[in-house]
Amino acid sequence: MHLYILRHANADTEAATDSARELSEKGREQARTVAKFCARHGIRPGVIFASPLIRAQQTAKPVAKELGMEITTARWLACGATPEEILAQLAALKDTAAVMLVGHQPDLGELIGHLLGAEGESVNVRKASLTHIEVLLPRKGGGRLEFAIPARLM
């Protein structure tokens, strides 16, 4: 399985609650940049899962639109998901060749670290960066890093 891991884009810091934070203008531009990058490079996952938090949904939306896809909201991508929990959800998709996850730090960084075999380590994932891991085995150390690129380099 090819796993495309996208951290939400830059979000405003002021909101009534953390879950209500929306993308800033910079974040909206970052999300559009990621969407165009995916289209230009033929990145077309079978499904796009996004955290229910507004900033993740707003990051996923331009990608889904550019690729002519829908977003599947995944509560298991809300803040606090463990690598094991995420991989358990992905295990049900064994016939899906490529999946995109749109979520949050530190969860995504912990998932990347887990798949790359880092013992209890989290990878620093920048906002609006896209990481591609080929998951050879859905377990610790079972992934191979293909690329990790921030929006500013796309």
Where are these regions (language model features)?
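Domain-level recognition of soluble alpha/beta enzyme cores
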Residues: 119-144, 150-154
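Short amphipathic alpha-helix with an adjacent loop that forms part of the alpha/beta core around
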Residues: 85-93
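Active-site-proximal alpha-helix that buttresses catalytic centers in soluble enzyme cores
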Residues: 2-84, 108, 121-128
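Generic beta-sheet signal
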Residues: 3, 95-103
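Glycine-rich phosphate-binding loop signature in dinucleotide/nucleotide-binding domains
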Residues: 41-43, 92-97
